[in-house]
Amino acid sequence: MIRRHSCKGVGSSVAWSLLGLAISAQSLAGTVTTDGADIVIKTKGGLEVATTDKEFSFKLGGRLQADYGRFDGYYTNNGNTADAAYFRRAYLEFGGTAYRDWKYQINYDLSRNVGNDSAGYFDEASVTYTGFNPVNLKFGRFYTDFGLEKATSSKWVTALERNLTYDIADWVNDNVGTGIQASSVVGGMAFLSGSVFSENNNDTDGDSVKRYNLRGVFAPLHEPGNVVHLGLQYAYRDLEDSAVDTRIRPRMGMRGVSTNGGNDAGSNGNRGLFGGSSAVEGLWKDDSVWGLEGAWALGAFSAQAEYLRRTVKAERDREDLKASGYYAQLAYTLTGEPRLYKLDGAKFDTIKPENKEIGAWELFYRYDSIKVEDDNIVVDSATREVGDAKGKTHTLGVNWYANEAVKVSANYVKAKTDKISNANGDDSGDGLVMRLQYVF
């Protein structure tokens, strides 16, 4: 028997309902016999309910990432030390299957680092049709496919923040809008995806900006601890008669300089403008990005790298905006466990600790480098000199997978820039950020 609780507010009612469902499920975990298909209830790693005939299922899960960082130099406007304490992500995730061939996924970000007040704080809200096997069709709001690190869940990326190359073309794999994507595993050794996405930007006729993405990955070896991964991707959008923000303002690997979800560095946080402009109608013709990705894993060791190049063609009497970047990363699990890998999606997954007492310990190093060429900047300013702006970071980190639900991380980041500085004239900075993650 389920009792109804009276709570003030819809959010409170939902929270109590989910709590009651979870508590009830703990006592009912196992197989439940019904007059139709039997129901299997699992409570390890969230709440999962499914029929034995696999026609219907749902799973309630989530992730919580609590970060704390301290940083100075380039990362702050005056060069002095600032700190930030915030929830990087706080997702409630609900997904499952309906009538076997339909999959659904809804992820809502309670930290408000995804989305906005008008569109909702949805990380994802999508429906996937799998009846055209091996091709899957996804509809709704989701992250368009571009890049190995973006394909990998934020729960299991090695560094706390993804590589800098995504900051020079942040639209290629974001989720701002709605669209359709077709994807497929090919021949048991490759993954292909293509999407058309309607962005939340319009031209003068009210027609939304359309984004087109293609990604192809060849992975003849794709077992845990034995991975060879080579990929190519391309993204394009038509910006004619549109007002689109093309500013390139990387955080240089330190989210706390400017973030939601808690307390950031406030007005002293520095996000330098490397190039581009605010949303002004008619400045740009189109925007195209292509990239390369590669990875190799052997036992507890893994290496990966990506390269990205962007060209924004000018519409008026302006110069084109060009940007490029790359990163290279090495990681090693001291306790011997390999990184898991999924060919469907062409992405790395978690590290599962073999020793329940000490967990799994991973060390890594990553080098990032970006360059932005904006010849529309013809006069030096207090923080930006004429010429190509460059940025690079060295990131050294450790991840402790205490168990399959808890992950503790610490990253040290050293940044260096050229042709761009903070208001104090600093072109280098240091930062330390830590995270406690819980997933269910």
Curated annotation (Swiss-Prot):
The keyword Transmembrane applies. One of its GO terms (cellular component) is cell outer membrane. This is Porin P. Homotrimer. Trimer pore size is 0.6 nM. It is a multi-pass membrane protein. Keywords: Cell outer membrane, Chloride, Ion transport, Membrane, Porin, Signal, Transmembrane, Transmembrane beta strand, Transport. InterPro entries: Porin_dom_sf, Porin_O/P. GO terms for molecular function: porin activity. Belongs to the OprO/OprP family. It is found in: Cell outer membrane. Residues 1-29 form the signal peptide. The keyword Thylakoid does not apply. Its main location: membrane. Coiled coil: none annotated. The lineage of its organism: Bacteria, Pseudomonadati, Pseudomonadota, Gammaproteobacteria, Pseudomonadales. Anion specific, the binding site has higher affinity for phosphate than chloride ions. Porin O has a higher affinity for polyphosphates (tripolyphosphate and pyrophosphate) while porin P has a higher affinity for orthophosphate. GO terms for biological process: monoatomic ion transport.
